[in-house]
Regions:
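Bacterial Sec-dependent N-terminal signal peptides
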Residues: 1-29
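Disulfide-rich extracellular domains of secreted proteins
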Residues: 27-248
Length: 248
């Protein structure tokens, strides 16, 4: 067994957050705690994508912020009638010539602002036929989706009393074993059905907070040929405003 000598410490603070209204004071709603921590000869890669934009399939390259528009729609690239949104991202092999490269940990996060429409004092669901803590996942080399359920709902605004601003939620799923079983863990990761508010979002405080939603894959990999590192992945939830955004 090779004893690892750590020559420096690398900590990855994974902050899954949604930018919300400017009137609310910045607060940590779910304390950030380690989900993974190890000393390995390896590193981390991350990919992800949005689920809301100006058009369902076109790239937005304008000068304005996406969430400032009042008619944002779901991104939907898959032509699959069973999905209401979908997007993908390519995770490339950082060391394609390293035959010793192994997958250590892979986590999938998804998050969105999920405030419904207030009808006679009752807030509707944005996707009444879908559970927000489920998504559809298509891994590299696959041609069909698998529906997965979150290992943990890190935070959900709708569970708070009173509701918090734009009803954000954050979910996480450990997909390490599924990725390890692939012939090639690198390639296109595609996610569908991240529930989120479309169009225009007015917070519970009657401010324009903007729509938001997306997903992220975090992969920790290792190889005897890489440097020794201490890698720690944190997750939690904090409200972030333009004036108060320092969580050090």
């Amino acid at each position: 067994m090779k004893i690892l000598k750590t020559n420096y410490t690398k900590r990855l603070l994974l902050i899954i957050f949604l930018l919300i209204g400017f009137s609310l004071q910045a607060q940590v709603k779910k304390v950030f705690t380690p989900r993974y921590s190890a000393s390995i000869t390896g590193d981390v890669k991350m990919v992800g994508n949005n689920m809301l934009s100006r058009t369902s399939t076109g790239s937005y390259n304008g000068e304005q912020d996406n969430h400032d528009f009042v008619d944002n729609v779901y991104v939907d690239i898959d032509s699959d009638a069973s999905t209401f949104n979908s997007s993908s991202a390519n995770l490339t092999n950082p060391y394609p010539n390293d035959s010793c490269l192994q997958i250590e940990k892979v986590l999938l996060y998804w998050a969105a602002a999920d405030k419904g429409i207030d009808v006679a004092g009752i807030e509707t669901e944005n996707q009444p036929n879908w559970n927000y803590n489920n998504v559809k996942l298509m891994l590299p080399g696959q041609t069909t989706y698998t529906t997965i359920n979150a290992d943990e709902v890190i935070y959900r605004g709708k569970n708070q009393n009173p509701h918090i601003n734009n009803d954000p939620y954050v979910c996480v799923k450990d997909i390490t074993n599924s990725v390890k079983n692939l012939g090639n863990p690198f390639g296109k990761y595609q996610v569908a059905n991240v529930e989120a508010k479309t169009g225009f979002l007015v917070s519970h405080e009657n401010t324009n907070t903007g729509t938001s939603g997306g997903w992220q894959v975090i992969m920790v990999y290792k190889s005897d040929k890489l440097k020794a590192r201490n890698i720690t992945l944190f997750d939690g939830y904090a409200n972030v405003t333009s004036s108060q955004n320092n969580f050090d």
